Amino acid sequence: MEFILSLIGSLLLIICVLVSVAFLTLLERKVLGYIQIRKGPNKVGLMGIPQPFCDAIKLFTKEQTYPLLSNYLSYYISPIFSLFLSLFVWMCMPFFVKLNSFNLGGLFFLCCTSLGVYTVMVAGWSSNSNYALLGGLRAVAQTISYEVSLALIGFKILLFSLL
């Protein structure tokens, strides 16, 4: 029974994160519309609130294209795996209700974020383009350098909280 409640809580958390991202993109489009002295997205529904869902429907119904010489499976799996990793990181966040409470949440966070590097590298490699591979390697180098500084800042906070 506890496993089912944990699974339902995790699914509810993922759905809430995805909906909040959709409305943050709507907020971004509204702010950009006001900055550029136009109304922004307001054609769908009441004040454009269903606009992110209409954008998602439009995105999923578009034709899928891929480079001819690419590795088809890894070309499509790597962004999906990256999305799952970013949603999986939310499982270690402490909440008022104990969803998945474990002691090594900080280490789990660092491990999940470091796995995201591989998805970028595989996405660049699987397109069989030298330019995409170089762009993927640059993104990997940048991500690794950011992760090192993030880990050092996290360890510093942990060290000062123990004193």
Swiss-Prot record:
GO terms for molecular function: NADH dehydrogenase (ubiquinone) activity. It is a multi-pass membrane protein. It catalyses: a ubiquinone + NADH + 5 H(+)(in) = a ubiquinol + NAD(+) + 4 H(+)(out). One of its GO terms (biological process) is aerobic respiration. Its EC number is 7.1.1.2. Its main location: mitochondrion. GO terms for cellular component: mitochondrial inner membrane. Pfam families: NADHdh. Keywords: Electron transport, Membrane, Mitochondrion, Mitochondrion inner membrane, NAD, Respiratory chain, Translocase, Transmembrane, Transmembrane helix, Transport, Ubiquinone. It is found in: Mitochondrion inner membrane. The chain crosses the membrane at residues 3-23, 77-97, 104-124, 143-163. It comes from the Eukaryota. Core subunit of the mitochondrial membrane respiratory chain NADH dehydrogenase (Complex I) that is believed to belong to the minimal assembly required for catalysis. Complex I functions in the transfer of electrons from NADH to the respiratory chain. The immediate electron acceptor for the enzyme is believed to be ubiquinone. Belongs to the complex I subunit 1 family. This is NADH-ubiquinone oxidoreductase chain 1. It comes from Drosophila guanche (Fruit fly).
